[in-house]
Amino acid sequence: MNIKVTSDSTCDLSPELIEKYNITLTPLSVIKDGESFIDCVDITPEDIYRHVDNGGALCSTSAVNVDSYRKVFKELSARYDAVIHLTIGSLFSACYQNASIAAANFPNVYVVDSMNLSTGQGHLVIEACELARQGLTAVEICARLNEQRSRVYASFIMDRLDYMQKGGRCSSVVALGGKLLRIKPEIAVVDGTMKMVDKYRGSFDKCVEKYVKDILKEQKDIRLDRIFITHSPVPDGAVEIARETIKKYADFKDENIYETSTNCTVACHCGPGTLGVLFMKK
């Protein structure tokens, strides 16, 4: 079968991976001061950080609408035997619901809820592409993805809590205390939603090293074909610390460690100073 894999712009895959696997992205919208912008088309994460740092209100995001999905599915379903679309987790956004409504008009379009975001979602996108290259049918690929999504480990540590505070996800007292005490929470995707699972204290570099060590040292069933370091702007050297710590505590080769940048959705909710390590289990 000639299968096309598509995904929401929230998957945080690099331009190189998108080109390698010929992935089509459906962009979410970013709302800034009441005006709508298309994610990574006419607004970038840097635009959002600059806006907030200059005293602007926190930006928000909105799901891809049904009509936008329908246009993409109409074009691609006519050119391919099947289209598999992976959305950001359904508990984070209405994208899955909207994509499912749009896909109802096209019998060869399949929609999968990643139950994840960022490169947690991206892992499954790449997985779908690899399975298609192996010759599996669309139905077989979707079944495999639904089975594998619980094996994705996705988490981040955050240097700044002001974005969470402005978004109502932590109090101003907690945000101030985190800044004064240099506390970096670890936020993980658990059962399709985000939860604080740990916290670290100290410089960002030291917290990154401890965080990566903690999530890898006890894992005995990590897949070694792909791991992501996904981040917003972080202090110089932090990504390299994450990379070296990954190699120290797991047997990843350099070519299987992928560095990617966060999209506007993560930028809106987490801000700069966010770094995550995301992998799959066997």
Give the positions of each predicted feature.
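Short beta->alpha junction loops
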Residues: 63, 114-115
